[in-house]
């Protein structure tokens, strides 16, 4: 006879069997689904996660404020004097197909000078630090960026993930994607990626073989408000010698292995448009694959980067040229040992991003102005070895030199 106690035991036994069978089936199904996911799908998922992550912003005091869940990573320009607590005005969608590429980029990635610097650190390499193939030589350098920047989002983007990330960010500008996909050399894509990611998301880009010696919170002088700076660059080369052209592309060359920027900065718009248009021109002429190593610096590297920056400094769209004493040239920066400022751009001396090179006036690694150390791994062997007034890049302004 089946007693109440036996009934309870039997029921418990049956429920246990059902639970175990269900759990086993669920695990088998999950394993089956996981095994069918391609590497591309995984990369796409990672790219989407990175692109949708909201990085915290920081100010000069080290205080950080995160984005609210409803706030987009790229905000529209607020009216002058508007409080930062207001929600950005939603932009009306419009047809951008008839706009120039520069204007399309300005529409997609509007520039807000008064916002804080995004707390992103972007690096690229063949593997992520989680991979055994990452390389022990790079681990101390990569780790230094996280150690010096607690609270920042630090991403090492692989080549495959970079493709999906660019497709996510630049879906509305197919010309840019066509140029990125068409580039025949990894170094060209690596150069292009840094400008693209900073234009779209802002933050810091630095090569994988760089060591952070000081936090980015210390890069901008205390006397300069962070809401008046949108781009921080450093001197790569200042060859004060008669034969400088035999060794370097420009008399003053700005480095692009480390750049800090707010998203949408005009310099980034111009460099992205320039590289895109030149790439597509070469592609249609059938000469894109014929790029010598010593021409990379002029195509995507520090030479064209330097040219774009000087063009910006002398552009009447952003500066009041009528009251200018003349064009800003390399002479304004040669021999500098302290930061200078042109408009919303802070220019750091050669010691800041090139300490220890033992030439061109650069200090050593322990110099107070040394911020980033570069190991020059995988670098092209050729060519890479008194503040100015603050002016808003959003409207023409004077460029008078200050002491």
Locate predicted features:
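Glycosyltransferase-associated regions of secretory-pathway enzymes
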Residues: 1-190, 206-403
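Small-residue hinge/turn detector
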Residues: 191-203
């Amino acid at each position: 006879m089946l007693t109440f106690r036996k009934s309870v035991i039997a029921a418990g036994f049956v429920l246990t069997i059902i639970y175990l069978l269900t759990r086993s089936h669920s695990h088998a199904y999950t394993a089956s689904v996981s095994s069918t996911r391609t590497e591309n799908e995984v990369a796409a998922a990672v790219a989407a996660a990175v692109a949708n992550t909201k990085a915290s912003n920081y100010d000069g005091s080290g205080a950080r404020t995160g984005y609210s869940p409803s706030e987009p990573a790229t905000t529209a320009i607020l009216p002058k004097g508007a409080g930062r607590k207001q929600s950005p005005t939603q932009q009306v969608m419009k047809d951008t197909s008839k706009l120039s590429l520069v204007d399309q980029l300005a529409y997609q990635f509007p520039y807000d000078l008064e916002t804080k610097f995004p707390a992103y650190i972007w690096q690229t390499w063949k593997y992520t630090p989680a991979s055994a193939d990452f390389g022990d030589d790079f681990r101390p350098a990569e780790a230094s960026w996280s150690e010096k920047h607690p609270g920042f989002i630090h991403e090492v983007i692989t080549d495959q993930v970079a493709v999906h990330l660019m497709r996510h960010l630049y879906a509305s500008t197919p010309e840019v994607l066509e140029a990125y996909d068409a580039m025949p050399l990894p170094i060209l894509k690596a150069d292009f990626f840094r400008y693209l990611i900073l234009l779209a998301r802002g933050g810091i880009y630095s090569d994988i073989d760089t060591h952070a010696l000081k936090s980015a919170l210390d890069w901008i002088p205390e006397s300069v408000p962070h809401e008046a700076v949108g781009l921080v660059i450093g001197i790569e080369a200042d060859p004060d010698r008669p034969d400088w052209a035999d060794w370097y592309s420009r008399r003053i060359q700005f480095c692009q292995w480390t750049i800090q920027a707010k998203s949408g900065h005009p310099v980034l718009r111009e460099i992205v448009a320039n590289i895109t248009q030149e790439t597509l021109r070469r592609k249609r002429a059938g000469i894109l694959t014929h790029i010598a190593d010593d021409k990379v610096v002029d195509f995507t590297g520090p030479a064209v980067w330097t040219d774009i920056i000087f063009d910006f400094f002398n552009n009447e769209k952003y500066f009041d040229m009528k009251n200018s004493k003349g064009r800003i040239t390399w002479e304004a920066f040669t021999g500098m040992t302290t930061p200078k400022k042109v408009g919303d751009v802070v220019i750091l001396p050669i010691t800041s991003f090139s300490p220890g090179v033992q030439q061109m006036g650069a200090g050593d690694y322990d110099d107070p102005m040394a911020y980033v150390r570069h190991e020059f791994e995988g670098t092209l062997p050729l060519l890479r070895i008194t503040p100015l007034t603050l002016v808003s890049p959003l409207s023409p302004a004077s460029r008078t030199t200050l002491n």
